[in-house]
Amino acid sequence: MKRFFIKNASLLLPCGLQTGSIEFDSTITALRRSNDSCAPDYECETLDAHGGFVVPGLFDIHTHGAYGADFSDADFSDRNVLNDIHECSIHECSIHECSNYKCNEFDVDSFPLNSPLFRLSRYYLSQGVTSFLATTMTLCAEELFAAMHSIDAFCRMRDEFIKRTPNKLHHLAGAKCIGINLEGPFLSSSKRGSQAECNLLAPDAALFHQLNAASGGRIKLVTVAPELPGAFEFIRSVSGCCTVSEGHSAADYNTAIAAFRAGASHVTHIFNGMNDCLHRSPGIAGAAADLGIPVELICDGLHVHPAVVRGVFRVFGKKTCLISDSLRCAGMPDGRYSLGGQEFVLSDGCAALADGTLAGSAISLADAVRN
């Protein structure tokens, strides 16, 4: 494993920013919180940060895609390859061959590394994102199940690749998918944003559990509008197995408070897809501030004004979770793209539907951090 030494860096540590250096290979091996820039006494590649920031890998909990790919496309299938791999693992001998590779002489070409989701994961990694939640749109039930199967297949394939290849090839797998963020279909029509209205549903715990089973139990976050019929029963049923987030909702303050007390514990992109936070009607944002609930925040300069961004950090502090909410257009040129069966246009960094509704963002999470 190649070793690295980064000197003259501003290190982001639990205690804050510290000037120093860092040594690492597959893991961090040493931190020096000083101006000592002497390289280690072993062979390594030395990099000079010139005072730049060195931060942990980013975790994007809300990203629909980028680099031309979208998790809702449901275009990944590993059935044949995984069947070959599992068959191969049964035969513990070096001469057994399966699907163009040997057990002890592994052929990387056996994996679909050029498929959209592998390319997407490598794009995330190139942007400093080391883990993410694959986020789906409001789709019809058939399409949602297909997306669950596709993401599960990709996760299992990536895990198999990591298990069967040397460390020096692991970057080809890209960032790690930690699970699924189910943004819809249990949303309010009036606050749907770019979600397809025809596919919206009342909160349905049975459907959620079926989707979760189809995903291999990978759903980690689900958004619900708490004012919808059945929302509280849904929250009580689902909150034991994943985080329930309030969002795409016209809920008033009292309803939002009650939903948090019923088990919801997160807010989807604060200020977007919800009622305004007014002095006599604070809505979800005011309820979250009162109870100290973690909130997502899109920092692309379009979804939330920079002054409000600063206010969110002052009010919520460490419970502010930056997200990209990126679409397939992130990392791509201006043009027309699809989103959950709808067309949107990317122009000068703004992704919007034909009626001007913001469709999501075209930034990476690293861009959000910089902003």
Where are each of the predicted segments found?
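Short, electropositive alpha-helical surface patch
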Residues: L144-E160, L169-H171, F234-T243
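N-terminal metal-binding scaffold of metallo-dependent hydrolase/deaminase domains
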Residues: M1-P40
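Active-site-adjacent C-terminal substructures of enzyme catalytic domains
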Residues: F234, E246, T255-N371
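Charged helix-capping and loop-helix junction motifs
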Residues: S115-P116, A147-I151, D204-A206, H279-A285
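Divalent metal-dependent hydrolysis catalytic cores, especially in the metallo-beta-lactamase
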Residues: H64, E97, F106-D107, F118-D152, ...
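Divalent metal-binding pocket/active-site signature
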Residues: L182-G283
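Divalent metal-coordination and catalytic microenvironments
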Residues: A9, I22, S26, G51, ...
